[in-house]
Swiss-Prot record:
<keyword id="KW-0964">Secreted</keyword>
<dbReference type="InterPro" id="IPR000072">
    <property type="entry name" value="PDGF/VEGF_dom"/>
</dbReference>
<dbReference type="InterPro" id="IPR050507">
    <property type="entry name" value="PDGF/VEGF_growth_factor"/>
</dbReference>
<keyword id="KW-0339">Growth factor</keyword>
<dbReference type="GO" id="GO:0048010">
    <property type="term" value="P:vascular endothelial growth factor receptor signaling pathway"/>
</dbReference>
<dbReference type="GO" id="GO:0001938">
    <property type="term" value="P:positive regulation of endothelial cell proliferation"/>
</dbReference>
<keyword id="KW-0873">Pyrrolidone carboxylic acid</keyword>
<comment type="function">
    <text>Snake venom VEGFs that may contribute to venom dispersion and prey subjugation by inducing vascular permeability and hypotension. This protein potently stimulates dermal human microvascular endothelial cell (dHMVEC) proliferation in a VEGFR-2 dependent manner. This stimulatory effect is correlated with activation of the MAPK Erk1/2 signaling pathway. It also appears to be a chemoattractant for migration of these cells and stimulates their radial migration in a collagen gel. In vivo, it induces angiogenesis in a Japanese quail assay.</text>
</comment>
<dbReference type="GO" id="GO:0008083">
    <property type="term" value="F:growth factor activity"/>
</dbReference>
<dbReference type="InterPro" id="IPR023581">
    <property type="entry name" value="PD_growth_factor_CS"/>
</dbReference>
<dbReference type="GO" id="GO:0005172">
    <property type="term" value="F:vascular endothelial growth factor receptor binding"/>
</dbReference>
<dbReference type="Pfam" id="PF00341">
    <property type="entry name" value="PDGF"/>
</dbReference>
<dbReference type="GO" id="GO:0016020">
    <property type="term" value="C:membrane"/>
</dbReference>
<dbReference type="GO" id="GO:0038084">
    <property type="term" value="P:vascular endothelial growth factor signaling pathway"/>
</dbReference>
<dbReference type="GO" id="GO:0001666">
    <property type="term" value="P:response to hypoxia"/>
</dbReference>
<comment type="similarity">
    <text>Belongs to the PDGF/VEGF growth factor family. Snake venom VEGF subfamily.</text>
</comment>
<feature type="disulfide bond">
    <location>
        <begin position="45"/>
        <end position="91"/>
    </location>
</feature>
Length: 110
């Protein structure tokens, strides 16, 4: 069965989609512990833009709190804790930055 063009086009468009992200990718400084689950489902922008010079980019974000189990492999102790993850709420096709171009204002280190 052939999927109609409009369906194919709409499904591939730039939009927030459920995406699995690794907790260690989001929290790289927490490598000494094990997390269960090791990844979480969050909404992130992805999809195709009408032009190769454009990139699917988040224009709206919010934070979600998720309950995760943290396991300390040295002591074999575990505890439930709330961790924060960024979800994308709105996406747009925006011009890609040229290599070497600054990313914009940098956050000040804490």
């Amino acid at each position: 069965q052939v999927r109609p063009f409009l369906d194919v086009y709409q499904r591939s468009a730039c939009q927030a989609r459920e995406t699995l992200v690794s907790i260690l990718q989001e929290y790289p400084d927490e490598i000494s512990d094990i997390f269960r689950p090791s990844c979480v489902a969050v909404l992130r922008c992805s999809g195709c833009c009408t032009d190769e010079s454009l990139k699917c980019t988040p224009v709206g974000k919010h934070t979600v709190d998720m309950q995760i189990m943290r396991v300390n492999p040295r002591t074999q102790s575990s505890k439930m804790e709330v961790m924060k993850f960024t979800e994308h709420t709105a996406c747009e096709c925006r011009p890609r930055r040229k290599q070497g171009e600054p990313d914009g204002p940098k956050e000040k280190p804490r």
